[in-house]
Amino acid sequence: MRIDRYISKSRVIDIESTDFESAVSELLSVCDVTKERGITKKGLLADLLDREKQMTTYLGNGVCLPHARIKMKRPYMVAVGRCPKGLVYDGQPEYEGIRFIFLLLASKNARNYLFSLASLARVFQDNGHMDRLRAAIKITDFRKELKQVFAGEENKPRRRHNRFNNLILREAAKIAKGAQCTSVLV
């Protein structure tokens, strides 16, 4: 899944807060969730913090991935924050190691929610990708690296079969059939 499609430059920020709750609140402030009916920033923050108390979203490698399913029109919304000094939350020491918070908001109708979480987790496990993100000093460089890291291999242009390619393939198949070949190498 191409997560980079859901990352907007305006939702990639440097977090100024030092505690987890305020950091998530900063990320929510750059998300346009107030346009959706029945969703308040305060209620969404409470849901995210409740989920965090039940089970941590800290994945290791300096990454925290709070996520929630909400009623919204778009399938996904991703906000990313850098925390160079780590965060404080309920006295838990692992939060001090957090350097990135990826907030994933998914529509209740989104089909590939678990697949999206898995795609994000795969990137976070790759030390090469994480080193590229850590190496970006300016926020503009970080945004660029973020897009490249999440675009992955799918960022390469796809090869399309055009009429000419199809014509050559059909003619090659005819020649191969006439020569009693069992396969065609193009």
Roles of regions detected by a PLM:
Residues 1-186:
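Cytosolic covalent-transfer regions centered on His/Cys nucleophiles
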